[in-house]
Amino acid sequence: PYTTLFRSGQKHLLKDVMSLPAQNLSTFQLKGQSEKAPEWYVPYHGKKLRGQALLDQIQLWEERGIVEPSHAHALRECIAHPEWFDLSDRTTVLFGAASEAGPLTWLSKWKANIVAIDLPNTRVWSKILDTVSEGNATLYAPSAETLPADTSIEVLKEKLGANLLTQIPEIAQWLIQFKQNLDLAAIAYLDGEKHVRVSMAMDAIMKHVSE
């Protein structure tokens, strides 16, 4: 049952979905308002550890066996190379962009190009738009209609989004239009059997985009 999709009252096999007629999705671009350089820190006991304070804490963790030496080394390398966090040359597709476990908040601080896919839902897009607006990243979001560049956030919350369960060919065709190399992150989560369906949908889209 998980390998089938219903569109316009017709049942289709998942493997045939990409060849179905699909509505074109438009792209809305939003630039974050922050001019801050990319930053990285470790949240710990209500503090944001960075620099020497973080190095001291890493040393304690390592001495007490809380982190393995390779873990401590990796953290020290991150501190030594702040340039690693400038992702202005990367384009990351987030399937389920508003996911609590996802990297949206960090990517929004690291100048990333974020291609956000999530349900057309006011609450979901309120989170995505507010997060990106406060940061230094650039958002690319799907919309069923072409929206003017000066469209307000309040309107965008109502207009953006695409459904991974019902718009598989639309999302796949939309992603293929991007000329950049895409980093694909399948982080959408749904409860129960819908999670199996959304996982298979993400796999199908990623396979199609990567071919």
Which positions does each model-derived feature cover?
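Extended charged low-complexity segments that act as oligomerization/scaffolding linkers
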Residues: W125-K179
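Conserved acidic E/D residue at the C-terminus of a beta-strand in Rossmann-like folds
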Residues: A116-N121
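A short, basic/flexible loop-to-alpha-helix module at the beginning of a structural domain
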Residues: P69-S88
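Short, small-residue-biased leader/transition segments that mark boundaries at the very start
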Residues: Y2-L5
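Extended alpha-helical scaffolding regions
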Residues: L156-E158, N163-E211
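Helix-enriched interaction subdomains in cytosolic or periplasmic regions
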Residues: T27-E63
